[in-house]
């Protein structure tokens, strides 16, 4: 696989199949900014992860999950300075492990985890096209909501 090149700061979302990131399968990562909308299956990411350590600023939802899964798989991430989950928590917004709760309260239409994968413990992995679309929607929400969350934190 060729190296991934992304221009500008970006949001990323790491999708897993299940609710326990310590043991469940990582599916892939979505990248989003005004120039890029990209989904990378996790097995492909492991072959070309260098962009995760670039100087570009990155933001995510649940950095602890992202960091743990990457480390567990011998990967690293640098310059991830904003966690939407922590920001929303500090602002007393409705947060859960499922980013859809927060996004839908902010007028995004993101499917809840169980709508895409089925009940926890009985999940079914859908086609990669569905995973990619749903994961990119989540990274888009992270990217587009960052400024508003930062402004609310500063006020």
Question: Language model features by range: what are they?
Answer:
Residues 91, 95, 107, 147-150, ...:
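Hydrophobic/aromatic-lined pockets within catalytic cores
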Residues 1-105:
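Conserved RNase H-like, two-metal-ion catalytic cores of nucleic-acid enzymes
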Residues 106, 110-117:
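A basic/glycine-biased coupling hinge at the interface between accessory DNA-binding modules
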Residues 78, 115-155:
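Mixed-charge, glycine-rich, non-catalytic linkers/tails in nucleic-acid processing enzymes
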């Amino acid at each position: 696989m060729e190296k991934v090149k992304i221009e500008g700061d970006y949001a990323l979302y790491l999708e897993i199949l299940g609710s326990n990131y310590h043991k469940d399968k990582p599916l892939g990562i979505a990248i989003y900014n005004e120039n890029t909308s990209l989904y990378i299956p996790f097995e492909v990411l492991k072959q070309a992860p260098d962009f995760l350590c670039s100087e570009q600023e990155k933001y995510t939802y649940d950095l602890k999950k992202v960091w743990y899964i990457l480390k567990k798989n011998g990967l690293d991430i640098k310059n991830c300075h904003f966690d939407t989950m922590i920001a929303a928590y500090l602002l007393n917004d409705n947060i859960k492990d499922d980013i859809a709760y927060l996004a839908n309260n902010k007028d995004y239409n993101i499917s809840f985890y169980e709508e895409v994968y089925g009940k926890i413990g009985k999940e079914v992995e859908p086609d990669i096209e569905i995973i990619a679309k749903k994961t990119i929607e989540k990274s888009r929400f992270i990217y587009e909501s960052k400024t508003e969350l930062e402004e609310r934190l500063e006020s």
